[in-house]
Every structure is written in C-alpha cells, then in structure tokens.
C-alpha cells in the first residue's frame, strides 16, 4: 500500500451547480482523506501560472478565462495510489468519453467545463499542491 497525495480542483461550473459537497462525498466514499482544502477565485496570473505548460496551445486563453470565471475549490487528497484512483474517479477529460458514474460524466458541461482537475502524476501533484498550499495548510490525518 502506497499512500500518496494528489491535487484536485472543483472547477467554476461545478461550484456554480452547488455540487461541492456531493463531490467531496464521492472523494470520501472512494477512501480519500481530504487533508487540505480552500475556496478561492483565481486571478488571471494564478490561472496562467498554474496552466503554464499549456501556454501557446489553442485552448489556453479559453481555459484561463473559464478558470477565472468564478470560485474554485482546491484540495489535497491523501490515500492509497491517490493520483491514479482520483483520475479514475474523475473520468475522461472529455465528458463525452467519461464512464457513467464518474465525476465528469455526472457534473461536466463540456470538454473545457469538465467540473474537476486532478494531477496526472506524483510529480505534478507535488508541484500543484505547492502552488496553492504551504506545508502548514495541509493536515495529515492518522485515523
């Protein structure tokens, strides 16, 4: 058993639908511990910095515009094989391809407004967590 941390964003469209609690319930039902979480409204600079790897791609400006269109909830999840299990719970990036019962199948509106973000590797998780959280803001749970 390998306990990992992964990073999650509940995106503006899901926040607007008032499904934060439903998504958090799904995290906990899947065995994740939420060890850090906060709601914030991303500035253009924060969104551009977070998604810097996509700069220059055709969807970049629309992604930044969407991610700054309303509040988001950023979270740190902890659990066994957390990165892959969280990705499985989210479903395919394109909700049209997401399996029934995944977060994106249930809450996404489109390819861009796909309800959630999750780290794609342990390395990305560490970078993304550090982008939004100081170590003192993460509370490891032992029970």
From Swiss-Prot:
Enzyme type, top EC level: transferase
Cofactor(s) needed for function: Mg(2+)
Membrane-traversing stretches: none
EC numbers, comma separated: 2.7.4.6
Subcellular location: Cytoplasm
SUPFAM superfamilies: Nucleoside diphosphate kinase, NDK (SSF54919)
Residues the record marks as active site: 117 (pros-phosphohistidine intermediate)
Keyword terms: ATP-binding, Cytoplasm, Kinase, Magnesium, Metal-binding, Nucleotide metabolism, Nucleotide-binding, Phosphoprotein, Transferase
GO molecular function: ATP binding; metal ion binding; nucleoside diphosphate kinase activity
Superkingdom, taxonomy of origin: Bacteria
Binding-site positions, ATP: 11, 59, 87, 93, 104, 114
GO cellular component, one term: cytoplasm
Function according to Swiss-Prot or TrEMBL: Major role in the synthesis of nucleoside triphosphates other than ATP. The ATP gamma phosphate is transferred to the NDP beta phosphate via a ping-pong mechanism, using a phosphorylated active-site intermediate.
Protein name as catalogued: Nucleoside diphosphate kinase
Gene source species: Erwinia tasmaniensis (strain DSM 17950 / CFBP 7177 / CIP 109463 / NCPPB 4357 / Et1/99)
Gene name for this UniProt entry: ndk
């Amino acid at each position: 058993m390998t306990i990992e941390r992964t990073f999650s964003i509940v995106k503006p469209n899901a926040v607007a639908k008032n499904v934060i609690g439903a998504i958090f319930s799904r995290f906990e039902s899947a065995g994740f511990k939420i060890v850090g979480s906060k709601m914030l409204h991303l500035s253009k600079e924060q969104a551009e910095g977070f998604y810097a790897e996509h700069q220059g791609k055709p969807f970049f400006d629309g992604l930044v515009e969407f991610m700054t269109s309303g509040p988001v909830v950023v979270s740190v999840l902890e659990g066994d094989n957390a990165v892959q299990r969280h990705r499985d719970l989210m479903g395919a990036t394109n909700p049209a391809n997401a399996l029934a019962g995944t977060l994106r199948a249930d809450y996404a509106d489109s390819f861009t407004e796909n309800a959630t973000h999750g780290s794609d590797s342990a390395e990305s998780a560490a970078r993304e967590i550090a982008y939004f959280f100081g170590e003192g803001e993460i509370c490891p749970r032992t029970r």
